[in-house]
């Protein structure tokens, strides 16, 4: 089922102690990441799983005032989370890229909420995760809740 809302409203679906997966590489859902970080003072113990979180200086949830709000589990330690992990507020998870979908599916890495980017749905309701679909498909399949801003730069799947 598709529901449209604002990023701030969608971020309210994230609860304390949830496990949140954030799509990486060139498809980081920046508007959702910011909306989640903006709720940092309301949240506690949110486990943030990310891979290839490149392209920014530091993730907005990696701030001292959020040290009790967000614990980072990085599947690839990139510049946006490196200092946060070095300060002890997160951990690196050593895994081959091809093994990670199995970790999601077996529940070893649980996903309550997946923050992804997607294309506009086609006539049949299908979306594309674009060029960063490496872990997005398995994350979407395993998450209890999927939140994705509709990206008009992602190609829409033909019907």
What are these regions (language model features)?
Residues 55-56, 121-123, 155:
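Short, acidic Gly/Pro/Ser/Thr-rich loop/turn segments
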Residues 26, 52, 76, 96, ...:
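A broadly conserved detector of short glycine/acidic/proline-rich loop/turn motifs that flank catalytic sites
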Residues 153-159:
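Conserved small/polar residues in nucleotide/adenosyl-binding loops
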Residues 1-79:
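N-terminal active-site beta-alpha-beta segment that forms phosphate/nucleotide-binding
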Residues 84-147, 151:
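Hydrophobic alpha-helical hairpins/lids featuring a short glycine-rich hinge
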């Amino acid at each position: 089922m598709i529901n449209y809302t604002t990023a701030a409203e969608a971020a309210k679906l994230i609860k304390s102690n949830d496990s949140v997966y954030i799509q990486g590489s060139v498809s980081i859902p920046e508007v959702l990441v910011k909306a989640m970080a903006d709720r940092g003072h309301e949240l506690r113990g949110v486990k943030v799983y990310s891979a290839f979180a490149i392209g920014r200086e530091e993730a907005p949830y990696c701030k001292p005032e959020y040290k009790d709000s967000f614990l980072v589990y990085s599947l690839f330690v990139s510049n946006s989370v490196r200092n946060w992990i070095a300060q002890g507020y997160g951990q690196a998870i050593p895994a081959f890229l091809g093994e990670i979908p199995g970790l999601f599916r077996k529940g070893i890495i649980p996903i309550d909420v997946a923050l992804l980017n997607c294309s506009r749905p086609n006539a049949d309701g299908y979306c594309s995760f674009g060029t960063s679909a490496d872990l997005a498909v398995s994350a979407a399949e395993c998450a209890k809740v999927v939140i994705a801003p509709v990206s008009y730069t992602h190609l829409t799947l033909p019907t």
